[in-house]
Design a protein with these regions (language model features):
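Detector for repetitive beta-architecture
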Residues: 14-16, 34-36, 53-55, 84-86, ...
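Acidic/polar low-complexity surface segments
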Residues: 54-78
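Short, T/G/N/S-enriched strand-turn elements that build extracellular solenoid repeat scaffolds
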Residues: 2-8, 25-31, 43-51, 76-79, ...
Length: 204
């Protein structure tokens, strides 16, 4: 696709690929504009590595009985070096989520240690808990985190290069849009817990 259509790529969702089961490493790596890749199951490490404009969705199987936001669904180093595109993750991601992300947008229901490490751009909306050392070396981009899920402890956030800001209407509009998309793609029940009434529960 990149060879034929170049940097411009194809319109969003031109080619939709659906998978089931357990994917190996690097599912959706370097996926380009126009692709939509959806897997009902789980993925391993390096999910969305170098994402370059595609939309990636990983969701729990329809017949699953467990709570998605309490279980890991993708491995470590998801979205490593992503430059653009979107990812909707119906569960918890492992360590180093969005490391070196420079432009992709991601919604996830929890992350392990070192989340958003060295992130320089893009958006991460985290609907669950974060691990230790969040935002180490993060020099750009935005992470939205719900306070009710996370204690403000010295080992939770690496404050060397980040600051918290008061959210404005634009932020709330972004969050609302991402929640609607996440629900549309994954039917995650956790989205129903976060309405506009929960706006004061956010850290930015």
């Amino acid at each position: 696709m990149s060879k034929k259509y170049g940097e411009k790529g194809l319109p969003k969702g031109t080619l939709k690929l659906n998978f089931t089961g357990a994917a190996g490493q690097s599912f959706g790596a370097f996926a380009t504009k126009g692709l939509e890749m959806k897997i009902e199951g789980n993925t391993n490490d390096y999910f969305g590595k170098g994402l370059s404009g595609a939309t990636l969705i990983v969701k729990v199987p329809k017949k699953s009985t467990f709570k998605s936001h309490e279980n890991i669904i993708t491995g470590n180093v998801a979205l490593y070096g992503a430059t653009s595109g979107e990812a909707y993750i119906n569960g918890i991601a492992g360590e180093r989520f969005c490391v070196r992300n420079s432009g992709a947008t991601a919604v996830v229901e929890g992350v392990g240690d070192h989340g958003c490490e060295y992130m320089t751009g893009g958006i991460a909306l985290i609907l669950g808990k974060i691990g230790r050392n969040f935002a180490a070396g993060m020099s750009g981009g935005i992470a939205y985190i719900f306070k009710s899920n996370n204690e403000f402890r010295s080992d939770n956030f690496n404050m060397e290069m980040i600051e918290f800001e008061k959210l404005d209407k634009q932020d709330y509009d972004i969050i609302k849009d991402l929640l609607e998309k996440h629900y549309s793609y994954t039917q995650s029940s956790i989205c129903l817990l976060y309405t506009s009434d929960a706006a004061d529960d956010l850290w930015c």
